[in-house]
Structures are given as structure tokens and as C-alpha cells.
Amino acid sequence: MNNSYYGVDIRTIDSIAMADLLSQILAGNIRKEDREELEAQGRMPYGGLYESMTTSIEAYYAIHENMPLAAFGIGLCPEGCSIWMLGTTMCERHKKALVACMQDYIKDSLKKYKVLTNYISKDNTKALRVIKKMGAAFGEEVETGGKTFVRFTLKE
């Protein structure tokens, strides 16, 4: 998926060393919403990023002018395939590029995997709005770490 969107390049995370470096960089400036979701799951930003990148069946990062903005990918879960994205505070400045990228990524991923799912904190209203615009259906709610998460599902 090595593409470019409005000056934001998308590259494959293709090594443990790259995952480690990206996790360190992204964790230092992670979005408040992502930090809170990770902490509710009992994970710190570096660990959550690193685990997501290294256990996924595919993982990518978005970069602008040599500064990583976000990482995203697909991991396996009991329900099938779990799509995820964790980003920095710089994501807001590059929202148009990242939304276009994720629209393409979801479309391509649904062709391969048919169904994508995950949970988003109900407090993460921006992410819920975006994923809804991309066609997500919302389902069960679960409590973890003092936060309510809602399950979303995307289907081909």
C-alpha cells in the first residue's frame, strides 16, 4: 500500500527494528484519545504501538516530511480481522490525507478479509464519526479500565 495522499506518504512496517523506532517516535506525541484508550486496556503507548505493529498481519505508517504521523494495520482476533490506527497530535493537521488513505485501505482490506472489526472508546467522538462515515455498523458496548468501548464492524 505504499501510496501518497496530499504529501503524506504511506509505507510498510517491514521489520522489528522499524516497529521499535516508530513506536518510540509515535509514543512521544500520541493523541490524547489514543493514549486514553491504550491506558484503559492496561497498556502504555510504546507497548501498545509496538504490540500492534509486530503482531499484525500487515502494518503501515504515515509520514510527512520525515515525521511519522500514525501507524495502522490489521491483526487477527477471535472475530476475524481487527483494523487499528494509532496516531500523533499531528494527525489533525493532515486529516484530509489520512481520511483518504483510510478510505482506500478499508476498501482494499474488505476485498481481502470481507469483515473488519474493533472497538473504539465512546469518548473518542472524532474516530467514531469518521468510522461511521466509512460505513461502520456499531454493536455491543464493553467496559474496560473505566471506559466504555463500542464495537464497530465494516463489511464488504
Feature-to-residue mapping (PLM):
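A short helix-loop-beta-strand connector motif used in the catalytic cores of GNAT acetyltransferases and
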Residues: 49-61, 70, 114
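A short beta-loop-alpha structural element at the N-terminal edge
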Residues: 2-29
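Conserved GNAT-fold acetyl-CoA-binding loop/helix
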Residues: 30-49
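Conserved acetyl-CoA binding element of GNAT-fold acetyltransferases
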Residues: 79-91, 150
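C-terminal "cap" of GNAT-fold acetyltransferases
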Residues: 144-156
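Conserved beta-strand-loop-alpha-helix junction that forms the acyl-donor binding cleft
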Residues: 113-132, 143-146
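Conserved beta-strand in the GNAT
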Residues: 61, 66-76, 81-82
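Conserved acetyl-CoA-binding loop-helix of GNAT-fold acetyltransferases
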Residues: 93-108, 129, 133
